[in-house]
Amino acid sequence: MKKIAVLTSGGDAPGMNAAIRAVVRTAIYNGIEVYGVYQGYLGLINDDLKKLELGSVGDTIQRGGTFLYSARCPEFKDKEVRAKAIENLRSRGIDGLVVIGGDGSYRGAQRISEECPEIQTIGIPGTIDNDIPGTDYTIGFDSALNTIIESVDKIRDTASSHARTFIVEVMGRDCGDLALWAGLAVGAETIIVPEEKVDIKDVAEKIESGIKRGKKHSIVVVAEGVMGGQLCADELAKYIHVDARVSVLGHIQRGGSPTGQDRVLASRLGGHAVELLMDGKTALGVGIKQNQLTQTKFEDIFNNKGSKFDKQMYKLAQELSI
């Protein structure tokens, strides 16, 4: 292994810069040249690569986002387009590629490993949704979780002051981990996630029951993949008359300085990715389980989507929100 490239793809997540830093410094420490690919897979297609030195990643571990930029690249699904990207890697003598991102990013890496076996590929899970099998946590999840908690704590102050019900919409298209963990942490009265079917009438009855017990306000946390916050409020209004407001947290969840946990996680996974490349491994996603570094085949990751949801935690949240 003499030259590797690293890119970030898909939605940005706090801690991506820390992962890039770990990849670059681990590689250089072991005598490997590193090239940064700008704007994800689009950069591979356009040959937008730049050699990275130790100084290139100085003062980045605490920064949110990704200094390599990120972009969604649907055209990478085209085999002819991928062939151009692969040729760009070959022409530079790059024999290893580290991809930081989510499910779609991993699929692009798998295609490269299939169509050009001499270029090894390793995926690092970077997404706030925490929806990648093969790891307990993805880079950015803890940071986004803490952003949500801080925001909802402030929203609850207002909800309490005005005796209102607040519907808080958080990210999570197919995975409800952000909603579940945040809802449990802020003491939400109701948590609505894609993995568990919820009848809005039951939610309304629960809120009404609380009001009868003297409860003045409620917090409902809903994952965007189930329904929008406004739709949730409109549906509730069919069953109960409460002063309900909607707060869509949106892209604030992706921004900000990564937490200590995300910085450490990103550093460990970034270093491990380089070690796997040096060992001749390919088509693997790195992760962490029970605080131990792991690696999982891309195909196993794709075949186990939706397997991570913690039903016991959901049950606990239901019991604590009576």
Swiss-Prot record:
The keyword Protein transport does not apply. It catalyses: beta-D-fructose 6-phosphate + ATP = beta-D-fructose 1,6-bisphosphate + ADP + H(+). ADP binds at residues 21-25, 156, 187-189, 213, 215-217. The keyword Manganese does not apply. Mg(2+) binds at residue 103. Its main location: cytoplasm. InterPro entries: ATP_PFK, ATP_PFK_prok-type, PFKA_ATP_prok, Phosphofructokinase_CS, Phosphofructokinase_dom, PKF_sf. One of its GO terms (biological process) is canonical glycolysis. It is an enzyme of class 2 (transferase). Keywords: Allosteric enzyme, ATP-binding, Cytoplasm, Glycolysis, Kinase, Magnesium, Metal-binding, Nucleotide-binding, Transferase. Pathway: Carbohydrate degradation; glycolysis; D-glyceraldehyde 3-phosphate and glycerone phosphate from D-glucose: step 3/4. Homotetramer. PANTHER family: ATP-DEPENDENT 6-PHOSPHOFRUCTOKINASE (PTHR13697:SF4), PHOSPHOFRUCTOKINASE (PTHR13697). This is ATP-dependent 6-phosphofructokinase. The gene is pfkA.
